[in-house]
Amino acid sequence: MSRAVVFKSVSGINCDMGRKPSPVRSLEPHVAFYTVVLGFTVAGRDEQSAALKRDGVQMELVVTPDHNPATSGSCYFDVSDVGALRQEFLDAGATPGAIEVQEYGGKRFRLFFLKEDYDNYCFCFGEPA
């Protein structure tokens, strides 16, 4: 399925998310979240890991049974249209936060947050304001 919003890049906010595989306690709920809600496709998968892709972004997940959700990180996705993406997530049954404007490094961004319930990951989606 083609989507109007383009994911341009990903970077970890307080972790290596997007650069290293993200630990998850169970693969299935995360693969479902990434595909159904976030609009990723499965690029590769085995019993212990999955690679997921949307546009220019690839995320990797690895099963880590002793992963503590309290240590889960956050990541920032640079996207082409936060308003359309937020609506896409609402249509998929998610509950994203409101769009707000924040300043970081002297630049202003329109962004919103979406929390993942399985392992406590927090995703931020933004674009220059």
Q: What residue ranges belong to the model's regions?
A:
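A generic "binding-loop/recognition-motif" signal
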Residues: 27, 48, 57, 82, ...
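Conserved active-site tyrosine of GNAT-family acetyltransferases
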Residues: 30-35, 89, 120
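Conserved short beta-strand elements that form part of the metal-binding/catalytic scaffold
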Residues: 41-73, 122-127
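Conserved acetyl-CoA-binding loop of GNAT-fold acetyltransferases
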Residues: 37-42, 93-95
